[in-house]
């Protein structure tokens, strides 16, 4: 069984389709940064992803994909961020969704995701994101549609500092 493979843990993951809906009246679209400083983005991500790659490796990967038009990074009020990990031929994978700890519960991420879903739909793009069990209820509450469910394996024996450039 999958759960018995040494040095791996089994995680349940759902795929959600982003469904456009209106952000709250408090949302300020002028506070969305379409080309934020990647150093600021990394600071937000560090608060939400404890196993995030070290900055030089992350920066090399993300900046390369952004320069070549494959990815886009956005922020809202320099407190929430998301990445259009792959944006290709009107198909978008959204990932690295995070909000600074001090702003969690403010509704920033919820509004930002709703705005992003509308923004992408206006461009004729179909967007999805993956969510682990702990975040599934959040995406359902936003109104995103669960379209698939699967189990993935994650290695448990590799420490962050052991990750090398080739791991990307």
Indicate residue ranges for each PLM-predicted region.
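Helix-loop element at the rim of GNAT/NAT acetyltransferase active sites that forms part
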Residues: 43-55
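Conserved acetyl-CoA-binding loop-helix of GNAT-fold acetyltransferases
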Residues: 99, 105-122, 141
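Conserved active-site alpha-helix within GNAT-family acetyltransferase domains
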Residues: 1-10, 110, 133-150
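Acyl-donor (CoA/ACP) binding surface of acyl/acetyltransferases
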Residues: 73, 78-92, 110, 124-125, ...
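A short beta-loop-alpha structural element at the N-terminal edge
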Residues: 28-43
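A conserved beta-strand-loop-helix scaffold within acyl/acetyltransferase catalytic domains
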Residues: 52-98
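Acyl-donor-binding surface of acyltransferase catalytic domains
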Residues: 1-29, 150-158
């Amino acid at each position: 069984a999958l759960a018995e493979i040494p040095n791996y843990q089994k995680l349940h993951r759902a795929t959600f389709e982003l469904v456009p809906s209106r952000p709250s009246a408090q949302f300020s679209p002028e506070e969305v940064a379409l080309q934020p400083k990647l150093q600021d983005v990394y600071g937000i991500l560090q608060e939400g992803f404890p196993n995030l790659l070290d900055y030089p490796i992350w920066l090399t990967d993300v900046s390369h994909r952004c320069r070549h038009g494959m990815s886009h990074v956005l922020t809202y009020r320099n407190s929430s961020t998301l990445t259009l990990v792959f944006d290709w031929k009107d198909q978008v994978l959204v990932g690295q969704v995070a909000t600074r700890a001090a702003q969690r519960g403010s509704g920033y991420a919820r509004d930002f995701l709703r705005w992003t879903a509308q923004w992408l739909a206006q461009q004729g793009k179909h967007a999805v994101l993956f969510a682990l069990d702990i975040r599934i209820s959040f995406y359902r509450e936003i109104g995103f549609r669960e379209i698939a469910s699967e189990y993935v394996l994650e290695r448990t024996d590799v420490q962050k500092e052991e990750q090398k450039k080739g791991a990307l």
